[in-house]
Curated annotation (Swiss-Prot):
InterPro entries for this protein: Csc1-like (IPR045122), CSC1/OSCA1-like_7TM (IPR003864), CSC1/OSCA1-like_cyt (IPR027815), Csc1/OSCA1-like_N (IPR032880), PHM7_ext (IPR022257)
Stretches that traverse the bilayer: 11-31, 92-112, 139-159, 380-400, 422-442, 475-495, 520-540, 562-582, 586-606, 629-649, 653-673
Topology with respect to the bilayer: Multi-pass membrane protein
Domain of life where this protein originates: Eukaryota
Name of protein: Uncharacterized membrane protein C24H6.13
Modified positions (Phosphoserine) in chain numbering: 725-727, 729, 737, 761
Role according to the record: Acts as an osmosensitive calcium-permeable cation channel.
Gene Ontology CC terms, in alphabetical order: Golgi membrane; plasma membrane
C-alpha cells in the first residue's frame, strides 16, 4: 500500500500547483484583456442603460494600482456602485476573512506546537492536527481556545446582526426609500372570504389606508398574454432570420454577377416560406409568418377584452393595501404583528417593501392549506434529494482517500503503482472539482421547487434557495465527504478491530481536513481567477455571441444588459467555507491559513465584479446577509459537537463538560439573537422615520425599536379611534410618534452622529477596511450608530424620488401588444414586412442597419425599451 502521508503530501502539492497555475493564467489573461475588452471587464462604466449614479469611473490601468484602488474604496462607494445586496456580501467575505486572519494569529502559536510536539507520530499535515496529540491533558488547550475563538465568532455575529438592523432602518428612512411606492404598500395574503368580499372590514382594520387593490383570478388572461408573447418572439425571430438570409443571398448574387430577383417578397431570395407545426411532431403544419401575424391580431382583441373586464373576474385571497406614507404603513404592519385585533381573522402573511416586479403573481391565489401542502411536497422532495445525493458525493469522498482502500479492495491495486504526481491529481484535484460540479446542478431545481411551494416574491425564492442549498452543501460537501473520508482512511483498521471503530473514526476524523485543504485551494485560487477572467462571458462576447445573436434585440441585450448575481446561490458556497473553517479551526487549525488566503482573494474578485461588471437584481435590501450570519451557528454546533465527541472517546471528562457548557451557551445565544433581531428585519421604528424626515429632535431607539414597535402595535386600536375622530393624518402622526417617547428618553444625548447632508464625495470617505476596524474598536458608536449609517449612504439616497403611479396589478393587465424589431435592410424587405403586417402587428426597423459585410447592427434601443424605474 502507498504511504498515506506521501499521498497526502502529493495531493496537496498537486492541488497547489494545479490551482496556482490556473490562477496565474486566469489573472494574467484578465490583466491583459481588461484594457481593451471593456464591454466584458468594465461594462458598467460604458453602457448607456446604466443609471448615472450607478456608473463608476474607469478603474486604473496599472495592474498593481488596480488592487489598491479596489481595496481602498469606502463603504459609501461600495453601497452606491455594488448596491446594498452587493455591499453586504462584500462585508460578509471581509468579516470572515478577517476572522480567519485573527484565528491564525491566536490559534497557530498555541495549537500547532501542542499538536505537533511529543505526539503519536503522524506524518504530513496530520502532525499538526488533533489526531497527533498523545497527552490527553493537552486537550484543555483545545477547549479554552475553542471558547475564545468561538466566543469571538458569536460576538461578531451579534455585532453584524445589530449593524444590519440599524442599516436597514436607516436605509428605509432615507429620502429615496421613504418615498418609494413599495415603502407604503402592504400585501396581505390568505384572507377569508368574509373579509375579502366585505371591504368595510378592511376599511375598519386599516382606516389610514388610501387604496385597496384585490387580486383577481387572471389565469385565462395570463395564458393568452403568454401565448401572444411567445408568438411575438417567434414572429420576430422568423422575420430576422428570413431577412438575414435574403441579404446574404443578395450579396452572393452581386458578388458573382448573377441576375437579381425581379420582384420583392419573402420568397424572393429564399426558396420556401418558413413553416412550423402547432404541436410537436403531430401538429398541423402552418405558414409561420401568416399564422403569427393573424393569431397575434386575434389575441390582441381577446386580451384587450379580458383586460377591460377586470371587475368580472373572481377575487382571490390576497389584497394590496396602499397607505399615504411609510409611517402609516409601518404603524399598520406593527399592529399586524402585535395587536390582538388581527388574530381573530386568521390572515396569512403581511409583506411590506415589495415592488410589483418582485411578486410571483401566480402564487397569490393559493389558499393557506394549498400553500402549506405544496411547500411540504417541495421540502419532502429536497429532503429525499439530500439523502440520495449522498451516494455520488460519498464516492468523491472515498476517492480523496483511495490510498487507504487499496489494501482490502483488490481491484484498486493498480492505483498503488501509479506515479505519485498522478496519484496526487486523483486524490487531490479530481474530488474537489467533481464535488463542485455536482453541487452546481442543485440550485436551479431548488428555485423551481421554491416557486412551486408557494413563494410570494423572487426574494423569497432566493431565500428558499439559500436555506436549502446551504443544507445541501453542509450535508453533502461537509458531513458526507468528511465521514466517508474518515471512514475510508480507517477502513482497514476497522476491519481488523471492529470493536474499536468509534475510536478509530474519531482519531481519523481530523485527517479528512486534507481534502478540504484541496477544496480551499480550488475555491481560493481557481474560482476567484475564473470570476475575474469571466471566460464564458468573453467567449459569448467574442465568438458564440456572433453566432447566436442573430437579431437586433439579442445583440442589444448582449451589450446593454448586465448579468446579476443570484444571492440564494452565491451565499451558500461561501457560507460552507465558513462552516468548514470553523469546524476544523480547533481540530486541524492549519486549514484556517488556507481559508484566510481564499477569503482575501474572493473578496477582491467580488469587489471588482460588483463594482464594474455585475448589475443589480431584485432589491433584497441585504436580507441574505443576516440569514448567512445565522447559518454560521451550524458551523459552531458541528465544531462543538465534534470536539465533545472526540473528548468523550478520549475519556477526558473535564474537557467534555467544559465544551458541553459552551455548547449550551452557543444555543442560548442563537435563540436570543433570533428573538432579538428577526422581528426587526422588516419593521421600521416610527421614530427612525420621523427622526430623518419629519421630527429631527426624535432619536433612534437604543433597543433598535423593539419596545416601540410592540407599543405601537398594541396601541393600534387607540390610534384607530383617534384617527376616526380626526379630519386628517396630522393627529395620527402625533399619536404614533408619542408611542416612542419612552424610547426617546433612553437615548444617550451625547451620541455622536453625522448629518446626511454633509456628504460631499464618496472618494473622501475612509476605506471600507479602515472603517470596519475603527467601528470594531469603537463599540459605543456601533451601539448608537444610526446617524453614522445615514452618513454612509450615498448622497442620492437623500433625495426623495419622484416616480410615476405604480400599480400593484398583474403584469398581464398591463401587457401591451408585442413590438417586433427587425433590421432595416438595403433590399426593402423590412419595409415590405411592415406593410404586410400593418393593422395587425406593430413592426419596427428603427435604430438598425446592415454593415458593408452584410451583418446586422443596432444603432439604438429596441422600440419597446423603457428605462427601469424604482418602485
Amino acid at each position: 500500500m502507498s504511504d498515506s502521508s506521501s499521498s497526502s503530501t502529493s495531493a496537496f502539492v498537486s492541488s497547489l500547483v494545479f490551482n496556482f497555475a490556473i490562477f496565474c493564467a486566469f489573472i494574467g489573461l484578465f490583466l491583459c484583456l481588461r484594457p481593451r475588452e471593456k464591454h466584458v471587464y468594465q461594462p458598467r462604466c460604458i453602457i448607456d442603460t446604466q443609471p448615472k449614479e450607478e456608473k463608476p469611473e474607469p478603474s486604473p490601468s496599472s495592474p498593481f494600482g488596480l488592487f489598491a484602488y479596489v481595496v481602498k474604496r469606502s463603504e459609501t462607494y461600495l453601497i452606491q456602485y455594488a448596491g446594498v445586496d452587493g455591499y453586504f456580501f462584500i462585508r460578509y467575505l471581509f468579516t470572515f476573512g478577517a476572522l480567519c486572519i485573527l484565528g491564525c494569529l491566536v490559534l497557530f502559536p498555541i495549537l500547532l506546537p501542542v499538536n505537533a510536539t511529543n505526539g503519536v507520530g503522524e506524518k504530513g499535515f496530520d502532525i499538526l492536527s488533533f489526531s497527533n496529540v498523545k497527552n490527553h491533558n493537552r486537550f484543555y488547550a483545545h477547549v479554552f481556545l475553542s471558547w475564545l475563538f468561538f466566543g469571538f465568532t458569536i460576538f461578531i455575529i451579534y455585532r453584524e446582526l445589530r449593524y444590519y438592523v440599524i442599516f436597514r432602518h436607516a436605509m428605509q428612512s432615507s429620502g429615496l426609500y421613504n418615498n418609494l411606492p413599495s415603502s407604503s404598500t402592504m400585501l396581505l395574503t390568505e384572507l377569508p372570504n368574509s373579509v375579502l368580499n366585505d371591504e368595510e372590514t378592511l376599511h375598519e382594520l386599516f382606516p389610514n389606508a388610501s387604496e385597496f387593490t384585490c387580486v383577481r383570478d387572471l389565469k385565462k388572461l395570463e395564458k393568452k398574454v403568454k401565448k401572444r408573447s411567445d408568438l411575438g418572439n417567434k414572429y420576430e425571430s422568423t422575420l430576422n432570420s428570413l431577412i438575414n438570409k435574403s441579404v446574404k443571398k443578395h450579396n452572393k448574387l452581386v458578388k458573382k454577377h448573377k441576375p437579381l430577383p425581379s420582384t420583392l417578397d419573402y420568397t424572393a431570395y429564399v426558396k420556401k416560406r418558413p413553416t412550423h407545426r402547432l404541436k410537436f411532431l403531430i401538429g398541423k403544419k402552418v405558414d409561420t409568418i401568416d399564422y403569427c401575424r393573424d393569431t397575434i391580431a386575434e389575441l390582441d382583441e381577446v386580451v384587450d377584452k379580458l383586460q377591460t373586464s377586470l371587475e368580472e373576474r373572481k377575487k382571490v385571497g390576497s389584497v394590496f393595501i396602499r397607505f399615504r406614507s411609510q409611517t402609516d404603513l409601518q404603524t399598520a404592519y406593527q399592529a399586524f404583528l402585535y395587536s390582538k385585533k388581527f388574530r381573530k381573522y386568521r390572515f396569512g402573511r403581511a409583506l411590506v417593501g415589495i415592488a410589483p416586479e418582485d411578486i410571483v403573481w401566480s402564487n397569490l391565489d393559493l389558499s393557506m392549506y394549498t400553500r402549506r401542502g405544496k411547500k411540504t411536497i417541495s421540502n419532502t422532495i429536497l429532503t429525499l434529494m439530500i439523502i440520495f445525493w449522498a451516494f455520488p458525493v460519498a464516492v468523491v469522498g472515498c476517492i480523496s482517500n483511495v490510498n487507504y482502500l487499496i489494501e482490502k479492495v483488490h481491484f484498486l491495486k493498480f492505483i498503488d503503482h501509479m506515479p505519485p504526481k498522478l496519484l496526487g491529481i486523483i486524490t487531490g484535484i479530481l474530488p474537489s472539482v467533481a464535488l463542485s460540479i455536482l453541487m452546481s446542478l442543485v440550485p436551479p431545481f431548488i428555485k423551481f421547487l421554491g416557486k412551486f411551494g408557494g413563494a410570494l416574491t423572487v426574494q423569497e425564492i432566493e431565500n428558499y434557495c439559500q436555506n436549502w442549498y446551504y443544507a445541501f452543501q453542509v450535508v453533502q460537501v461537509f458531513l458526507v465527504t468528511t465521514m466517508t473520508s474518515a471512514a475510508t482512511s480507517a477502513v482497514v483498521q476497522v476491519i481488523k478491530e471492529p470493536a474499536s471503530s468509534m475510536t478509530l473514526l474519531a482519531s481519523n476524523l481530523p485527517k479528512a481536513s486534507n481534502f478540504y485543504i484541496s477544496y480551499f485551494l480550488l475555491q481560493g485560487l481557481s474560482i476567484p481567477g475564473g470570476a475575474l477572467l469571466q471566460i464564458v462571458t468573453l467567449l459569448l462576447s467574442k465568438v458564440l455571441g456572433r453566432i447566436f445573436d442573430n437579431t437586433p434585440r439579442k445583440k442589444w441585450n448582449r451589450w446593454n444588459q448586465l448579468s446579476a448575481p443570484s444571492w440564494g446561490t452565491v451565499y451558500p458556497v461561501y457560507s460552507l467555507l465558513v462552516t468548514i473553517m470553523i469546524c476544523y479551526s480547533i481540530i486541524a487549525p492549519i486549514i484556517i491559513g488556507f481559508a484566510a488566503v481564499a477569503f482575501v482573494l474572493i473578496y477582491f474578485a467580488y469587489s471588482y465584479n460588483l463594482i464594474y461588471v455585475l448589475g443589480h437584481n431584485a432589491d433584497a435590501k441585504g436580507r441574505n446577509y443576516p440569514r448567512a450570519l445565522f447559518q454560521v451557528f451550524v458551523g459552531l454546533y458541528l465544531a462543538e459537537v465534534c470536539l465533545i465527541g472526540l473528548f468523550v472517546l478520549a475519556k477526558n471528562w473535564g474537557a467534555t463538560v467544559l465544551e458541553a457548557v459552551f455548547l449550551g451557551f452557543t444555543v442560548a445565544c442563537h435563540l436570543y439573537f433570533k428573538y432579538k433581531f428577526l422581528p426587526l428585519m422588516d419593521a421600521v421604528p416610527i421614530s427612525a422615520i420621523e427622526s430623518v424626515s419629519e421630527r429631527p429632535e426624535i432619536k433612534y431607539p437604543m433597543d433598535l425599536g423593539t419596545s416601540e414597535m410592540k407599543n405601537v402595535g398594541r396601541a393600534y386600536p387607540e390610534i384607530l379611534e383617534k384617527l376616526s375622530s380626526s379630519s386628517g393624518s396630522d393627529e395620527f402622526l402625533e399619536t404614533s410618534s408619542r408611542t416612542s417617547e419612552n424610547t426617546k428618553e433612553k437615548i444617550d444625548k451625547d451620541d455622536e452622529g453625522f448629518a446626511i447632508t454633509n456628504i460631499s464625495s464618496v472618494h473622501k470617505m475612509p476605506s471600507f477596511v479602515l472603517s470596519y476596524f475603527s467601528d470594531l474598536a469603537a463599540s459605543n458608536r456601533i451601539l448608537t450608530g444610526f446617524d453614522r449609517v445615514l452618513q454612509l449612504l450615498p448622497s442620492f439616497y437623500d433625495i426623495p424620488v419622484r416616480v410615476r403611479n405604480v400599480q400593484y396589478v398583474s403584469p398581464a393587465l398591463k401587457a401591451t401588444p408585442p413590438s417586433v424589431w427587425i433590421p432595416k435592410d438595403p433590399l426593402g424587405l423590412s419595409t415590405y414586412a411592415i406593410e404586410d403586417a400593418r393593422g395587425k402587428v406593430d413592426i419596427f426597423d428603427d435604430n438598425t442597419t446592415f454593415n458593408e459585410k452584410g451583418n446586422l447592427q443596432y444603432t439604438g434601443p429596441p422600440p419597446d425599451y423603457d428605462e427601469a424605474i424604482r418602485s
